[in-house]
């Protein structure tokens, strides 16, 4: 009996070791992302002015096939800037408030770069941990589908159990590694500290193609039109989810932004190719080859960005522009390369 008990204990230990093995690293554990989509369904007329015009719709509550962290919309065609809002909830929980998402047709690759132009897509919304979603729109959107991303290893009950074990094991390894690690080498002079692509999990979102390079004359600052209540621990997951949405839903080569900043003032390296290089992003149609793009994680049309994040954006600009011989103040002339959403035709400055 003792031998049988010992054998069972050893077998259980072996299974447990195999389960946690992927997390036994001195880097933060990142589970494999899960992505899936579903067609929109159960629309009914939206009450109010849009309903009076026969245009607005609201969906029934939709149960996703798996738990998700991010949801976005994609459709075939429609108005340049439809009014769209989403709300989500976890199984057994309360609905979030309705949150507006935007198409932002002006955010995307330059023409003739090989990356597809912006089509009918709404900004991906960070939902935390959610199982249900509902949308409403001021107009019907043909071919509408919902795209979901889970980057936290919580898509199913079994994945949630495995991820909990792996995160626990990883936390122990990180604690030991932190106490033994030598002091980090000094950064490049003037370069702000930032989370590398490797550390926010870009290995799960590999670029489709090699980077292209242009010339940095100016900086475009955006917000990602996302939730503002993400935690410090969730922020790298938000960056990874945006990368996956840009790459796999929009069809771009990589994440569109060159840099991202969270509400805590942490800076993240964006598109691959080198933070100190003039990498062409996908943040301002017609001007990407002449600029760098910085995105604030959150929605800041009604909620102000935090002082820490504003200072982080300033640190990027005050380092990045002089690095490439561009002034940080005063007028700058950019020449448009065109694009369907660009008000200036190609060749106009």
PLM region spans:
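Secretory targeting and sorting signals
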Residues: 1-25
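Extracellular/periplasmic catalytic domains that process cell-envelope and extracellular macromolecules
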Residues: 64-65, 126-128, 210-215, 250-253, ...
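Beta-sandwich interaction modules
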Residues: 26-67, 76-78, 82-149
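Extracellular structured ligand-interaction cores
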Residues: 68-70, 81-83, 130-132, 143, ...
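Long, well-ordered alpha-helical scaffolding segments within enzyme catalytic domains
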Residues: 65-66, 81-82, 91, 231-250, ...
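Exposed low-complexity, polar/acidic, P/S/T/G-rich flexible segments that act as propeptides
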Residues: 67-72, 129-134, 138-199, 204
């Amino acid at each position: 009996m003792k031998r049988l008990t010992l054998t069972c204990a050893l077998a259980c230990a072996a299974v447990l070791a195999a389960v946690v093995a992927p997390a036994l690293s001195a880097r933060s554990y990142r589970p494999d992302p899960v992505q899936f989509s579903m067609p929109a369904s159960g629309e009914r007329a939206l009450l109010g002015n849009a309903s009076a015009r026969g245009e607005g719709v609201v969906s029934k509550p939709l149960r996703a096939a798996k738990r998700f962290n991010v949801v976005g919309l994609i459709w075939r065609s429609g108005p340049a800037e439809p009014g769209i809002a989403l709300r989500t909830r976890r199984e057994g929980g309360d609905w979030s408030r309705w949150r507006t998402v935007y198409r932002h047709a002006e955010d995307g690759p330059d023409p003739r770069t090989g990356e597809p132009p912006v089509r009918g897509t709404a900004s991906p919304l960070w939902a935390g941990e959610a199982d249900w979603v509902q949308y409403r729109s001021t107009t019907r959107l043909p071919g509408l589908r919902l795209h979901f991303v889970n980057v936290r290893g919580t898509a199913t009950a079994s994945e949630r159990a495995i991820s909990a074990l792996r995160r626990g094991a990883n936390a122990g390894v990180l604690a030991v590694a932190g106490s033994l690690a030598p002091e980090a080498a000094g950064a490049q002079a003037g370069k702000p500290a930032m989370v590398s692509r490797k550390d926010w999990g870009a290995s799960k979102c590999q670029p489709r193609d090699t980077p292209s390079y242009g010339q940095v004359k100016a900086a475009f600052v955006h917000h990602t039109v996302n939730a503002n209540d993400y935690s410090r621990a969730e922020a790298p997951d938000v960056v990874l989810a945006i990368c996956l949405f840009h790459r796999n839903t929009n069809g771009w080569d990589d994440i569109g932004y060159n840099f991202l900043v969270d509400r805590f003032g942490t800076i993240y390296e964006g598109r691959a190719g080198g933070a100190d290089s003039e990498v062409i992003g996908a943040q301002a149609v017609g001007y990407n080859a002449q600029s760098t793009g910085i995105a604030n994680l959150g929605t800041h049309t009604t909620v102000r960005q935090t002082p820490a994040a504003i200072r982080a954006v300033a640190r990027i600009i005050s380092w990045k522009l002089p690095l490439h011989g561009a002034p940080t103040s005063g007028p700058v002339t950019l020449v448009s390369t065109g694009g369907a959403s660009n008000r200036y035709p190609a060749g106009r400055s």
